[in-house]
């Protein structure tokens, strides 16, 4: 699961440009100095124009007196459109659910807005009845941990604005963020800061069935182009080296590492922004600095079994670098947050932890070793890593959030379901990108976990999943579905857009994708479908985007990329209709 990323609203962000399509698409990327949006126009000027447009069109944008907008991202499309994603404060207080994207033409004229809150974000009062100390006590009690400093915020989620306190809480099972109503003392939300791949619901189902996960590890070696002490002749250190990982799940893999001395190597990739994997040594720490560096005298990492602590590290580093390469080569994205900063991971995290996480506090992947009972091995599998790192991409863009979380940690709501779906969509794309014969690509998630049903989720026919109760089609009840169960709606739409309906075999996997209305959908191909969904995520989705909003976002993206009269645009509409998401059934009061 992902956390509702509401710990804080950034007060300073890098303004960057971003790609729009797949490999070969021209794009402007972030770098040092001034970024040029067009001849004579900087991205700072684009952000300023978008900010001015937001205040000049208050009826459309909802921006008003007391509001301040801070640019999170500036996106420049090859065809000339500009999009600026803003986070909002009101009278100096961060607004949860107040994010918006302002759209401009090539000439910086206002063309529209995508906003998370369609209601006023000004609370009825800005005077709290609770003290910060009282809010901290309530948060500590709710989350079962030690509270940090409470800060006043405006909570504009759930259709109304309220004055609240946001409180970080450090508990035994990891950090969480609690939002407490500043007038009534009611706990409005209590959200873990980490995203677990295996949800509490699926773990409970496995326990009830007595089913264990014993992922099958790889045997044999994958041929490598570069191995050994390739940087040994370097005159100066540190230097780029090319080593070999002997992983648990994909055999031998090439790893780019850092040579620090003649026979001293560090599991850190200098060609990918310093991306690094460390050893948590059984601690449940959210501080990457507390992880122990992996070093070697031979530039060989692991032995392919759990007897070497380096084996899981090899899998993790391989999965992270493949994910980074997918996003860069497909979309020009430079790192998870598109800021040319490293991706990071810690393996051997916690004592008998049977899960893997994206942790937004750490900004890194965390992998447990398994609990020794139900989960037998570390979940350092390629699609798990691609899925979880995509939550990081969503955190850096739309910040899709669930609408509620129960006492067991299960999350609910369409925006949260869409987040899970996007993680599955791009996680499967990472497999196709890597195209590793030891991990054949497919539209299944968790197929290497050793589950009795042979997968955790699948995109072509989601309801074949009997563990989480994933749905194939939208209905009004999906708004209250657990997020992994609800994710099937948009995952199914993506598969239909990419591959079409009916029976087909791709690689070694046979698919048979149904449609709600009995229609036949002819896919446009995975490359184009992925371009549409990525552009929709980065340009047209916000924290509250639901499935009908996602339909609108992908139609806008298809129009941008291929034109409103194109086959691609029509197929996007058909794919959503085939999962029962249409303009006609758009709920009038979903916001």
Stretches found by the model and what they are:
Residues 125-130, 265, 460-461:
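Short, polar loop/linker segments at the starts of domains and inter-domain junctions
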Residues 2-9, 15-17, 23-28, 201-276, ...:
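Topogenic and prosegment regions of secretory-pathway hydrolases and membrane enzymes
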Residues 24-36, 103-118, 276-305, 462-467, ...:
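Short, compositionally biased low-complexity segments
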Residues 164-168, 186-329, 338, 353, ...:
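Acidic/polar low-complexity interaction segments
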Residues 389:
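Active-site neighborhood of glycoside hydrolase catalytic domains
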Residues 2-14, 18-215, 219, 341-358, ...:
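Segments that shape or occlude catalytic/ligand-binding pockets
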Residues 310-386, 394-591:
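Zinc-dependent metallohydrolase catalytic domains
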